C-alpha cells in the first residue's frame, strides 16, 4: 500500500508550480498536535511583515492514519483543511516539508495543491535522502516550496518573521495553541520593530541603556 502511495506522491509532485508571488499582506500558519486519535489543529493569521495577529482558530477532529515518516500528508491533511476552510490569506506556512522530501511532495506541497494557494514548508529537521537544492536553512528551520511560490520568496518571507529564537513567530503561536500551552494570543511587536523603538527612545531619554 505504501509503495503505491509513494508512486502517487511522485506523480503529484509534477503538479507543483513555482512562481513569483504577488504582494503579501496576510500570512497564515498552521500546526497540528495529537492526543491518541484526536487531532487539534491551530491556525494563526497575521499581517505581513508587521506580524500583528488578526485571527486565531483551533479545531479538533479524529484521525485514523498512523504517523509514518514521509507519509505525513495522509495524517494531517484533514485537520489542516478543516482549520483553513473559509479563511483568507496570501501565504500559508505549514509545519512540515514541501518539496524538501525524498519524493518531492511533502505535506506543505499537498496542502498547497489541494487549496490552490501559495504554501511554504517549514520543518526543524530534514528527511533522509532530501535533495539539497530543494531547501534553505533560515534561522533554526528548513524552508522549502510548498506550491505557487519560489524558494527565494519563501525564504524572504520566513526570514522577515523570525522571532528572537530563530523560529517563525506565527508558526510558533500555532504550535502553542495546538498543544494548549496558550489559549489566546496578544499582539507584541516583532523583534525588529522593538529594537527600532528602543533605539528611538534612546535619543529622547537620558535614562536609556544605549541599546
Curated annotation (Swiss-Prot):
Organism the protein comes from: Pyrococcus horikoshii (strain ATCC 700860 / DSM 12428 / JCM 9974 / NBRC 100139 / OT-3)
Chain positions of site Interaction with target DNA: 67
Keywords: Cytoplasm, DNA damage, DNA repair, Endonuclease, Hydrolase, Magnesium, Metal-binding, Nuclease
Location of the region described as Disordered in the Swiss-Prot/TrEMBL record: 182-211
Name under which the protein is recorded: Endonuclease V
Localization per Swiss-Prot or TrEMBL: Cytoplasm
Record's keyword annotation contains Metal-binding: yes
GO molecular function: deoxyribonuclease V activity; magnesium ion binding; RNA endonuclease activity, producing 5'-phosphomonoesters; single-stranded RNA binding
Cofactors that this protein relies on: Mg(2+)
Physiological role: DNA repair enzyme involved in the repair of deaminated bases. Selectively cleaves double-stranded DNA at the second phosphodiester bond 3' to a deoxyinosine leaving behind the intact lesion on the nicked DNA.
Binding positions for Mg(2+) per the UniProt entry: 31, 95
Chief location: cytoplasm
Record family assignment: Belongs to the endonuclease V family.
Cross-referenced InterPro entries: Endonuclease-V (IPR007581)
Superkingdom of this protein's organism: Archaea
Catalytic activity: Endonucleolytic cleavage at apurinic or apyrimidinic sites to products with a 5'-phosphate
Amino acid at each position: 500500500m505504501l509503495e503505491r502511495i509513494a508512486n502517487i506522491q511522485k506523480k503529484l509532485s509534477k503538479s507543483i508550480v513555482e512562481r513569483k508571488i504577488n504582494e503579501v499582506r496576510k500570512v497564515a500558519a498552521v500546526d497540528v498536535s495529537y492526543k491518541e486519535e484526536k487531532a487539534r489543529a491551530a491556525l494563526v493569521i497575521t499581517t505581513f511583515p508587521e506580524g500583528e495577529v488578526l485571527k486565531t482558530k483551533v479545531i479538533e477532529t479524529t484521525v485514523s492514519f498512523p504517523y509514518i515518516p514521509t507519509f505525513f500528508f495522509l495524517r494531517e491533511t484533514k485537520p489542516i483543511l478543516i482549520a483553513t476552510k473559509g479563511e483568507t490569506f496570501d501565504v500559508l506556512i505549514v509545519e512540515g516539508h514541501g518539496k524538501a522530501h525524498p519524493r518531492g511532495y511533502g505535506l506543505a506541497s499537498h496542502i498547497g495543491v489541494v487549496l490552490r494557494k501559495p504554501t511554504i514548508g517549514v520543518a526543524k529537521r530534514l528527511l533522509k535522502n532530501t535533495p539539497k537544492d530543494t531547501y534553505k536553512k533560515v534561522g533554526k528551520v528548513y524552508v522549502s516550496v510548498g506550491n505557487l511560490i519560489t524558494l527565494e520568496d519563501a525564504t524572504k518571507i520566513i526570514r522577515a518573521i523570525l522571532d528572537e529564537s530563530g523560529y517563525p513567530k506565527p508558526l510558533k503561536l500555532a504550535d502553542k495553541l495546538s498543544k494548549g500551552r496558550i489559549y489566546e494570543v496578544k499582539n507584541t511587536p516583532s523583534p525588529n520593530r522593538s529594537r527600532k523603538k528602543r533605539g528611538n527612545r534612546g535619543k529622547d531619554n537620558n535614562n536609556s541603556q544605549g541599546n
